[in-house]
Amino acid sequence: GAPVSYDRIYYIGENDFYIPRGEDGTYMRFEDAGEGYSDMLAVMNGLIPSHVVFNGKVGALTGPDALTAEQGETVLFVHSQANRDTRPHLIGGHGDLVWETGKFNNPPERDLETWFIRGGSAGAAL
């Protein structure tokens, strides 16, 4: 196909954290990862994250860090999730070209509002 171009690129990483809770229900703190290894492993084995955030922290993509674009700009979004499947959705818009598996040599899907990103992979939408 024809080459594509874009005005800006945004990376969105979904991150899962597995933080154990103490008997009183508060999140436990450890001096280092080794000290909390067995407690953290027990939470990870449950496969239910205690926190899911974007780009490593709560609020990373809001306020002054919001992903903005001017009307008419072409934006490439690269979206990844290390552990679980996810479905990015553009409210009020669509991905003209979507590579769910992130392989730009493959033909893209066209005109999707929601697409599927497999856990452990990244996809892209333009």
Protein language model annotation of sequence segments:
Residues 1-126:
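Copper-binding active sites and cupredoxin-like electron-transfer domains
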